[in-house]
């Protein structure tokens, strides 16, 4: 077998970078007499990118299609934020098979694909055990090693001479039950190549575990991975993607087609507010929506910009200041724990803390609706409306061992809840 595989991972909404990558992919395809495949290992989407955020990642799959992608696996940037139903939306617009074998049930995806004599399997990080049961989306995570072993066997029987795992598990992920290095070790002799993502590693010369080669192209479309297969030999390298690389016209043209669709959607007037649409307003909205006694909203989580002034609310400005992908939820919380949450959420250290889910923003103040914190009765329970950020341990306000078991309004996210409130 003589084959060139080009690969990317963790592009995270870098449209300009993807357009430059597409130019290199097209150039290599033109210059290379052998067959060339372009594969992506997930997380092309990004909530802080305008086109990606507004379309819940679908625009990025249209652009990846324009870049000439042959197959991609599902990452975690979109479905963890918007719910797994968006994966089917991505699959509908993608002009390549979207692969995901280890999470079930998910619509629109394939466990594997046979591209000529190359078998490709897709797996992604399940985050099993990281989130509470209430945020599992009803998805079951299958054990990756026996699953990939069986899929590889099936692909071999169907004629695959090379078996590639497009993996969003992470090259090294000590805190996770499985990563790419452990996958390669366990499946030596059954798979040939793992293209890694999720951990954003750049492996200039790749890695080898037994007979399995691992490759990863870093992040943000700054590099294009290149794998040369010549018989039994597999060579790995990465190609820098200079800023001066001209963008591919097909990617730019697709972005220009998407923009008017987005602008028309964003121009709609949703309703009016008679006071600033700020953290207090959102805490009130969450309390009312979830039929709760108390509403909580972390300002830096629900708003990424200045509050909207009183008056008409247009979708575009609303979405500009509310890029949160958190889901409204409700939980019963003891007065003692609620008091602790408010104390933490209003402490100077917590207010100034920057957490990764907020993409570098500070928490700012915890807003409280429907209750004077000084009047909390430690001996009773309160029904609290908030979002998963306030009600799950990764937000920093609650402890994992509290076992709150919130109920969430999936797949609605904060800005959609605001829209529904304004339209009533």
Per-segment meaning from a language model:
Residues 1-243, 280, 285:
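Acidic, metal/ion-coordinating pockets
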Residues 294-295:
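Glycine-/Pro-rich loop/turn segments that contact NAD(P) or position catalytic residues
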Residues 8, 14, 221-276, 283-289, ...:
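Catalytic centers of hydrolytic enzymes
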Residues 122-125, 298, 386:
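Flexible glycine-/small-residue-rich
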């Amino acid at each position: 077998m003589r084959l060139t595989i080009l690969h990317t991972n963790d592009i995270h909404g870098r449209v300009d970078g993807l357009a430059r990558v597409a130019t290199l992919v097209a150039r290599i395809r033109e210059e290379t007499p052998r067959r060339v495949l372009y594969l992506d290992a997930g997380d092309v989407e990004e909530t802080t990118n305008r086109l990606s955020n507004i379309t819940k990642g679908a625009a990025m799959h249209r652009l990846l299609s324009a870049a000439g992608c042959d197959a991609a696996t599902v990452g975690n940037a979109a479905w963890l934020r918007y719910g797994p139903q968006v994966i089917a939306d991505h699959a509908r617009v993608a002009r390549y098979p979207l692969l995901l074998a280890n999470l079930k049930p998910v619509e629109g995806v394939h466990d594997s694909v046979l591209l000529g004599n190359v078998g490709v399997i897709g797996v992604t990080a399940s985050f099993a055990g990281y989130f509470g049961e209430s945020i599992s989306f009803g998805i079951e995570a299958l054990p990756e090693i026996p699953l990939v072993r069986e899929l590889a066997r099936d692909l071999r029987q169907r004629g695959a001479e090379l078996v590639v795992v497009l993996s969003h598990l992470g090259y090294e992920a000590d805190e996770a039950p499985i990563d790419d290095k452990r996958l390669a070790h366990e499946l030596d002799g059954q798979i040939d190549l793992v293209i890694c993502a999720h951990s954003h590693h750049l492996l200039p010369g790749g890695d080898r575990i037994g007979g399995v080669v691992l490759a990863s192209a870093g992040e943000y479309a700054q590099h294009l991975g290149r794998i040369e297969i010549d018989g039994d030999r597999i060579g790995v390298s990465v190609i820098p993607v200079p800023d001066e690389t001209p963008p591919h016209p097909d990617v730019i043209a697709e972005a220009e087609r998407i923009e008017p669709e987005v602008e028309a959607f964003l121009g709609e007037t949703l309703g009016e507010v008679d006071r600033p649409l700020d953290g207090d307003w959102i805490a009130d909205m969450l309390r009312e929506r979830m039929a709760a006694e108390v509403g909580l909203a972390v300002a830096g989580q629900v708003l990424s910009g200045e509050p909207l002034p009183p008056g008409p609310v247009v979708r575009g400005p609303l979405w500009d200041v509310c890029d949160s992908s958190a889901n409204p939820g409700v939980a019963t919380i003891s007065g003692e724990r609620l008091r602790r949450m408010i104390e933490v959420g209003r402490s100077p250290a917590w207010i100034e803390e920057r957490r990764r889910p907020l993409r570098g923003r500070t928490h700012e103040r915890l807003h409280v609706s429907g209750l004077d914190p000084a009047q909390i009765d430690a001996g009773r329970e309160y029904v609290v409306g908030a979002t998963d950020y306030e009600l799950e341990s990764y937000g920093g306000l609650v402890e994992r061992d509290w076992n709150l078991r919130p109920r969430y309004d999936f797949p609605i996210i904060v800005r959609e809840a605001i829209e529904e409130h304004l339209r009533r």
